Amino acid sequence: MMYLAPRDVSPATPPSPALRHHGSKSLYFSMLRERGSGAGRIDELTCLASRHFLSEKLREAATIDAGFPTDLRSLTRVLQDSHDETARGYRSYLDERQAGAPRRYFSCRSHALHFLRTVAPTKLVDGAWLFGLLQRWQDPRLAPLIRIYLEELGCGIAPQNHVLLYKQLLARYGCDQWQDGPDEHFTQGAVQLALAHNADEFLPELIGFNLGYEQLPLHLPITAYELNELNIDPYYFTLHVTIDNASTGHARKAAQSVLDCMPRIGDAADFHRRVGNGYQLNLVGMGTPQAVASFDLEQELRRIIVDKAAVGAQLHSD
């Protein structure tokens, strides 16, 4: 079937200096506040700020080399090679551990819990970037992406809703207080919410972002393995190891959507460039390796003492 280029392959709106003061954290929470006539609607100023924020992050992403293929005809093979490399890397990791090597990520249980809090702003909007596609539910090219979104929501089954699963994980281990984290904790989550609210203007970037996000990274099975070692439920992470596969899972659906949306008539080169830029957008902000490396034992101890002091200050008799 011959498809025309999506109508929103045109260049994104340039940013306005008046809206550059919005930090990732403040914008993140602003985009979570629904205001308007329908579900998921935000006020006009926040929408404008989100668009300019996204433009800035895409310019940052354009400087990153994420190995996106120069020929989309090789996309499936390149992604399969990446998946195979992850599998080999994980097997090598397991061999190292069985030979007596220490954990690669988490030095102790507190380190792991710190990680859960650090990545919470991202995990609690899992799949949100696909929200903006719902109005295009009749477009068969986007049907696989909408299917991914519904699966992220658990297809209406609460125990399978990814955001709910992560909320329950945080509550179970006393990690609910993630809202006071620094601005960099919120960058990737803000990117995902901004894509959700600007899907029309940034459709190629959204498709590329989804492609990158649904690949299976090496850090995911390692994280699950080490959480389990520390007696922390790894189910949220093992679930994603299962569904983000290159055979029949989200990674395969994401790749197929890129190929289906590739314009047969129109500027295919520009579409390719913008999809690649969206793919690289996954690497903007704090990812798992940076979140793991950000742990400081002394700082974490100070945080715990300060929190407990605030609660118990008026409860001592001496």
What are the residue ranges of the model-derived segments?
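Non-heme di-metal
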Residues: 1-318
